[in-house]
Structures are given as structure tokens and as C-alpha cells.
Amino acid sequence: MPRRVTLTDRQKDALLRLPTSQTDLLKHYTLSDEDLGHIRLRRRAHNRFGFALQLCVLRYPGRVLAPGELIPAEVIEFIGAQLGLGADDLVDYAAREETRHEHLAELRGLYGFRTFSGRGASELKEWLFREAEMAVSNEDIARRFVAECRRTRTVLPATSTIERLCAAALVDAERRIETRIASRLPMSIREQLLALLEETADDRVTRFVWLRQFEPGSNSSSANRLLDRLEYLQRIDLPEDLLAGVPAHRVTRLRRQGERYYADGMRDLPEDRRLAILAVCVSEWQAMLADAVVETHDRIVGRLYRASERICHAKVADEAGVVRDTLKSFAEIGGALVDAQDDGQPLGDVIASGSGWDGLKTLVAMATRLTATMADDPLNHVLDGYHRFRRYAPRMLRLLDLRAAPVALPLLEAVTALRTGLNDAAMTSFLRPSSKWHRHLRAQRAGDARLWEIAVLFHLRDAFRSGDVWLTRSRRYGDLKHALVPAQSIAEGGRLAVPLRPEEWLADRQARLDMRLRELGRAARAGTIPGGSIENGVLHIEKLEAAAPTGAEDLVLDLYKQIPPTRITEAFTHLRTGAPCADRIGLMNVILAEGINLGLRKMADATNTHTFWELIRIGRWHVEGEAYDRALAMVVEAQAALPMARFWGMGTSASSDGQFFVATEQGEAMNLVNAKYGNTPGLKAYSHVSDQYAPFATQVIPATASEAPYILDGLLMNDAGRHIREQFTDTGGFTDHVFAACAILGYRFAPRIRDLPSKRLYAFNPSAAPAHLRALIGGKVNQAMIERNWPDILRIAATIAAGTVAPSQILRKLASYPRQNELATALREVGRVERTLFMIDWILDAELQRRAQIGLNKGEAHHALKRAISFHRRGEIRDRSAEGQHYRIAGMNLLAAIIIFWNTMKLGEVVANQKRDGKLLSPDLLAHVSPLGWEHINLTGEYRWPKP
């Protein structure tokens, strides 16, 4: 028997409930003149009302009213208003059951509604079985089926029938896909795949498990471990059309299942399923391993360059005393010479009476040496890391299938020469004419190509970052052009906030920019800039003072005293079946273990319900990144619907910031050292927090990564982010590229720029700018470049909006482009225009500054809550894999969201109780009450759950 699709009560309600919002009522329940004509043929008011109601419900949600069903007041009011009837007129409808059936029969005849039976049902079943391959979840296939029933005017069958049909369709689709993949495998490849479950690697684990144990590293040993696996997989020559016609989400699901099965579990699967999972894993792991190799190479290059920088800095630090003494000696000699010149004494006598000419020569030689030390270049020391590259680079270049854009073809030729061993230090056409590498390469001995090899590998790293060089099969380092939205699809998408013609955008921005510059000039002359001034071409901005009303702090403390302890509930779905987890308490233990940074083994000791292996099983099959995202979205949506949340905002603005977490070992997963946070390796959780305090998005990024490219990820990769219109961030989160992308996509980007006075404005006509502002103008906007590249700019923005590629991936590549890349430069020009408009708004609008400050304060307070939640293991993230780190951060963020939801709900109840008691609280005071408190929550101890 096929498994049944188990829809949750929430999912069933979403499919079958009657609409209640004004928008949905207008869309689905507006009656036409024809409808009103049929309705008016009923003589009695209650029959007219009931006939109209049944018509509307048959159209949407597409079902029959159940006997005695309670109709929402909004529906009664909306339909009654169109008929001139009231709620009382519906009371007597269908006193006779026959009346309701007669009306249903008449509606089927008038409008062509049909029951789910006969040929129509067979056609729908055939359609459903074809459509099932594209469904991404149980809820998705049910939604597709319901939508098709509505389109064909087929009355929805019972919920149990829908679940049974969808279950059968999903099982059939799964088996068809598995059979399709397995049938494309030659016998020799089948034998190689099945051998993965029998062979062992390192006499410890099966080859199958060994192959999936990989993470990017930061040294040559890590690179070689990755290359061992990649080389092994490349010997399995899978057919090129293996996955043709298989939806991407089906491929991803098969891979994820393969990453959770052990060899014993795989052997127990049906043969087609086993082969399909093995083949998909081999195909996907090849691309993932290639990406991991490139990432590891990137880290090795970065570590070598930083080590070379440290050598330079150490030399300067070691010579600090000598520099002071040398400068002091020159100052003394110079002073004596100046005095002698003034007194008319021979200068030679002054030198002779001092340290003498020999002493002066020694001093000059010392100064020359110190000058060389102070000007030391890290490239002088990169040759010390040559041995690192020799351990893995030849294999890497042999195994990676590289392609290049025309601008990087000279580099690809140099890579080919390096791969084949024909090292020719004269091949330097891949270097820019102004590159410092030329000077260092000329200084090498004849026949010594080691530095040239390092130069090639350094530039290969940069080319991967910018996308000028790519891999033929890759997730992160593929050809970006293949992912960009076609130019002809931009107009159809309608998701961009700018005109399609560059002339229109330029004319609008020039008019706005000229007007705002004049306004700023007038304010500067009149001295009316809020909290600031422009004096002698220098901008001065004072820090805003706190604006919390009197009594806000006391109110917060008073309200929190009345909140009861917190309990946490949530549910995830099974990776393969899509069914909710039946063991809800076990699942809550797993989520809690991740969120408080305790780990499953210690959670098993701290709970009274589950063993470690039970928690492991639940975690492997029910906990994944997408499940955390779905759960977070549910909590955020529920919190936004609470009345108390409206005192803090409307969910249309947000702030984002990175939070550093210490990790245990450097070079594993995303663990890197960022000098800003000391010498301890770690990672950053980059989170978005709405004006209602909801942490609606979070992702793990390397500690050394710039935060700016990740701003749009949180806004575009989930529904809550798409409601945001104004985005705040701190200084580290802005670049001109981000300004441009946000403006094109319709977001107002408002970063708090710490060094704002040092930033320059840009104008279309700098000479026409007000005189007070000309010292602030940094240059002229290049209109011609924007016009030439406008179609490609729109393609990039449309691709970001479509979600086919993560915005951060595109923005990182643009930021890594060489200076001569015109597209990156054109997008920067657009960003300069938008940044100039924003800076003028910021200078003239104190309220904007205050909103940004409030938004960023909410984000920083949210960091404190997460820090309190993750108190176990001293707050260190000790997971060794990127996936484990992501789950740890996602669990932490989910717990924070649940606490915020609970606090919001209970604070609302407290406020409502005080209102009933006659104590009215000012909305201005309530706006300063935060749901981020945790003092009333007992986070540690023994976790005892009631027996189910």
C-alpha cells in the first residue's frame, strides 16, 4: 500500500477554509451580473442568500458546504452586502436538506460544476500522476491538485480522498524517477556503484560513507583529502544524460537521503532506488567536491598572503626602536646644520665635530635599510609557501575542468602550461600592466619559475571569485551567465522597481539628485541641518541622543514580572515521506539541543524521555535547513499577527548584522580567524530582524567575509523578507553595489555609515552643484557607461529577484571583478547615485537617523538573546561540518524566535488585562517595550517532558 500523505490541520485549513480577508473576498466572492440574475430567481431571501453562498464556496475553495458548517461573519457580511441582505436572512436556509441538494444540482447545471467521479476523475488522476514529479512537498502536491480541481470546476472530494490520491501519485512519481535513473546506468557502472557499499576506506568505513565525509579546509592536506575523493568519483563515468528530465528538487532529495543512510540501510533498499541514490550522490558529490577544492585553494592563498603580511608587520615592529633612534639622529644632525647655516659656520666642520662623515654614512645606510623594511611587500615572502602549493596544485589543475571568459584566457593558458609542467615565467600576459608581480618576477633568477607558479595560483583564486574562470559542473563556481534570467523575460517578470529604458532612469535620478543637492545647499547656508553642519567643505554630524519616554524602563520591568515560564513546541517533516514527526517530544529535544548549544549526547542525559540514538534518528531524518526555514517562517508569521507586535512596527523595515561565534579549530567548515575578533577562529551568524523584533532570516558566513553581499539573501529568500521595504545595516554592510541592487529591486537601503563625513557625493554635473557642497563632490556620474550596461544590470537584478541564484553569490562575484570590468563599474555608478541620494536624505532627515538607530538597536539586543540561549559549551560552536554549524545557528535562531513570539503574546495579554483593570498604557511607552527578555525563562537544568 502506498503511504498516505498526512496533511496537518493547518495545511488542511489553508486548502479548504473560506476566505476572510478583504482582498480574498474581493477576488473570489464578487458576484457578476449573471450571478445576480440567477440568484434573484429564488423567491425567499434565505434561499437567495444560501444559493449565492453555495455558488461562492463551489468556486473557492471549490468544495461543498458541510451540514451545519459555521460561516465566518466576514463572508456573510460581504455576500449579504451585494444582495442587500443581512445575517438573519441566512438563518432559515436549508431547513430542508432537499433544498440544499436541489441548489447544488442547479448550480452544477448552470455553471458546469462536476463531481469527482467517472471520466473527469480519471483525467484528474492522470494529470495528478504526471504533475507529482514537479511537487516539492506533500502540501505542494495537494495545493496543485486543489488548484486543478478549481480550474476544471470539479468539486473537491473528501480530504481523505485527496490525501490518498496525492500519496499514490507521489509514490508513483518517486518510483518512476528512480527507475528512469537506474535504467540509464550501464551494467559496468552499476557494479561500480554497488561496490561503494562493500569496499572499505582506511579499514574503517565503507567507501560510500568515506566519499561523503568532506569539508573545505585551509591546508594542503585538506586539499589532498578532497582530491582523493574527487579523483575516485571521476573514475565512475556516469552517462551525461543521467539526470535529464529529473526535477532539481528530486535530485536534491535523493542526495540528501544518500547522505543520511549508512551502507546497511542502503543495502536494504529496492535495487532501482539504491542505484538511483548512489548515482545521484556520485554526480552531486563531484560538483560539491570540486567546489570544496576551489574553496580550500582560496583559503590556502589567503592564509599565505596573511602570513606574508604578518612577516612584514613583524619586521616593522622589530625595527621600531631603530627607526626612532635613526630619526632622532637625523633630527640632531639637521638641527646642527641649520644652526651652522644661520651662523655662517662651515657645514663640514659641524659634521666632523659630531659623529663624523663615517658616522653619517652609517646613518644613511641605516636609513636606506629601514626605508626598504618599511616598504616591504608581502609578495617578497610568498615564496616561503611554495611547498604548500606543490603538494596539491598539480592534481587540482589536472582534475578540475576549467573554462574562462575572454578576459581570463591568458590566465587559462598559463594554468594549462603549469598543469603540463611547461612552466614559462615569461608568460605574464595574465597580469595587469600595473601589477606589482612584474617587479618581483623580474627579480627572480633565470630558470626559477616558482614565483611565477605562485602568481598563477593567486590569480586563479581571484578569477574564481570574480567568475572569470569557472568549473563546468559546480554549485558555487559555475558559469554565472547560464543562471542569469534571459533578457526577454525581464519585462514579463515585473519585479524590478526601475524602468526598462536607461534614459528614463537617468532623467529621473538626475532631476532628483539636482533637487536634493540644492536643498542640502540651502540647509548648509542657513545652518538648518539637523544635528550637523557643513563648514569649509567638511561635514559634521552629531550623535543622536536617546529618545525613550519617561517611564518606559519601569514599564518593561513591571510587564515582564507577570510573564509565566516558557515552553517550546514545533514540528518538522520526514525527509523522504514528508510526514510530520510522530515523536513530537523527541523532536523538541533535538531542536532544543541544537538551539541551546548542548548537543544530542548531553541532551539525552538531561532529558527523561529519549536516548541518544533515538535523538540521532530523529535528527537525521527530520532536521534539515529547509525544515528550520519553514518552522521559522511559521513562528514569524504567528508573531506578526499578534496585536502587541503592531506597537513596534508593521513588519516593513528590518535591520541586519553579523554576530561572531568562537569555534574550536581553524580551517574546518567556516572556521577562520578575523583579526577584528582576536586570534581565535570562528564564524559569523548573519541575521535579519524585523521592526517587530522577529529574526526572520539567518545564515552562517565565514568570519572573514564582508557582510554586504548577504543583505539581500535574507530579504529575498523568504516571504517575510519580501514584505520589507526599508533595510538598515551597520557600516560593514554597505557597498555601492548593494545600494544599486537594493534600489533596483525596490528596497530602501539605509546603512548607518560610521565615517559618513569622509564619503564623497557624486553628481551628474558637479560644476552646477551649490558652492557650499563642491568640496564634498567626489566625481561625475558616468552616464554613458550606465546606458551601455543597463540591459545586463537589469538581467542581474531580475536573476536576484527570481531566486535562481543567491544574491550574495552574484554580488561577491561582482565585487571581485577586476577594475576594468565594465559591468561591475556600471553597477557601481548606479550605486553611487543611490548612495548620494541616501546620504543627502540622511543628513537632512533626523527621523531617518533615529529609525536606523532603533532598528540596529533591536538587532544588537537580539544578539544578546542568542548569546544567552547558546550558553552551553561556553558559547563555542564546536561542530566540524558546515551543515552542523548551520543547524546549530538555525536552531538558536528558531528558539530566539519562539521566545520572542511567546513574550509578544504574553505581553499582549498582560497589557489587555491592565486595560480591563482600568490602567491605560500609552502607545508611546509600549513602543519601547521589548519582547527580548529571558530572565523569566529557565534555560538550563533537567528537561522533563510529560509522558505522551
Q: Where would I find each of the regions flagged by the language model?
A:
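Short, conserved catalytic/metal-binding motifs centered on acidic residues
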Residues: 62, 603, 654-660, 727-732
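Catalytic or ion-translocation cores adjacent to nucleophile or general acid/base/metal-coordination motifs
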Residues: 89, 605-646, 673-791
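Long, compositionally biased intrinsically disordered regions
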Residues: 775, 781-948
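Eukaryotic alpha-helical scaffold "rod" segments
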Residues: 2-4, 8-20, 25, 557-578, ...
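Structured, charged N-terminal subsegments at the starts of enzyme catalytic cores
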Residues: 526, 533-606
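Short linear interaction motifs
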Residues: 32-40, 572-573, 580-586, 636
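Long amphipathic alpha-helical coiled-coil/heptad-repeat bundle
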Residues: 2-551
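Structured nucleic-acid-interacting core domains from mobile-element enzymes and related host factors
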Residues: 637-672
